[in-house]
Amino acid sequence: MKNWRTFILGLALCANGALAAPQVVDKVAAVVDNGIVLESEVDNMLSTVKHGAQEANQQLPDDTTLRRQILDRLIMDNIILQLAQRTNITISDEQLDQAIGNIAAQNHMSLDQLRSRLPYDGIDYNTYRTQIRKEMLIAEVRNGEVRRRVTILPQEVESLAQQIAAQTGNGAEFNLSHILIPLPENPTQDQLDKAEELATSIVEQSKSGADFGKLAITYSADAQALKGGQMGWGKLEELPSLFAARLQGAQKGSIVGPIRSGVGFHILKVNDIRGGDQKVAVTEVHARHIMLRTSVVMTDQQARAKLEDIAAQIKSGRISFAAAAKQLSEDPGSANQGGDLGWSSADAFDPAFRNALMHLKKGEISTPVHSSFGWHLIQLIDTRQVDRTDAAQKDRAYRLLFNRKFAEEAQTWMQEQRASAYVKILDSNGQ
């Protein structure tokens, strides 16, 4: 059950004492293989559903129909719980505690607050835990059984991804800022060179984090210069074709340009994008490192001091980073390549390594960094933006196909389980 956490909290908090009410007389509502469904279980859920519907102003069918649906649900749950028992699937106390903690967090409560809340709703905490454990077991069994039945072919993913791609960008709007470096009507080569040089410098400053609005006020000849170059929102088809062509695939925060037109050089900043599907880009880094491992003969302090000495030698020109890595690095995967780690997403690295790497400028060498692997001296060689839109569209297509097929197979699987089980209904109202 995808939303079992939310379901159970809603079930429990609106139960109005049903789960905790003592039962003087109980009857069997249905026999299910080696188990039973009690009348009290049906009555409790009936009361719960009615209370919840009243709170939500939701209309319900007549009692006979509602009771039959509830009994069917409890029978199915019983079948699955017996399957869990036969296949030795269990939910540990640790898993249960984590789930209840998640329920509390999702409802902006601490675990203690949740425990304190339950008695006010007439719910015993141990009964609550038992009910959640059942729901978790049911979800675990069903998901495991149904997942094995779902088959997704590569051509299905490709076909759906192409459909998604065909729809990408439709209706997207861009919030832009603009800087214009003007040119005279018939510019000389010198005027062209100077204007292009200034425009290129502004692009570099912007990409390095300079305030685009301030640069616009300082340099732009556009009518909106004093407003920081703000152009506001617009669709691609509403923009000059020169702009639209260069904005294809741009991301929020992108600096685009310089773009040459008849009036000068243009620089655009994408402040935001709304509507449509945005392109998916990730930052990849090209780095190299020297790694030392600590041991009985190499303490943390010694490793750090040795890397500091190596860094000083590299910066003074006495040895290159690559040569030092080949001689000294204890990373067998990169030492022979001069410590070169190639291109990779920053997320692929150890958190401490990644954090240090992302604070480096191109060519800069870090101070010694301690990670779960050892001590590192890191150099950032370059960064690049890589379009992952195609992969993202295929991932989305796969998820859509899986969810669709899972829902279909889950229904079929439950029908098969019900058909193969021995069920005798004794509740005349649930017939």
Curated annotation (Swiss-Prot):
Does the keyword field hold Protease? no
Q: What class of enzyme is it?
A: isomerase
Where does the signal sequence lie? 1-20
Subcellular localization, as worded in the UniProt entry: Periplasm
> Main subcellular localization, coarse class?
periplasm
Could you tell me the keywords of this UniProt record?
Chaperone, Isomerase, Periplasm, Repeat, Rotamase, Signal
Name the chemical reaction catalysed here.
[protein]-peptidylproline (omega=180) = [protein]-peptidylproline (omega=0)
> What does the UniProt function comment say about this protein?
Chaperone involved in the correct folding and assembly of outer membrane proteins. Recognizes specific patterns of aromatic residues and the orientation of their side chains, which are found more frequently in integral outer membrane proteins. May act in both early periplasmic and late outer membrane-associated steps of protein maturation.
Write down what this protein is called.
Answer: Chaperone SurA
The protein's organism comes out as Sodalis glossinidius (strain morsitans)
Gene name as annotated: surA
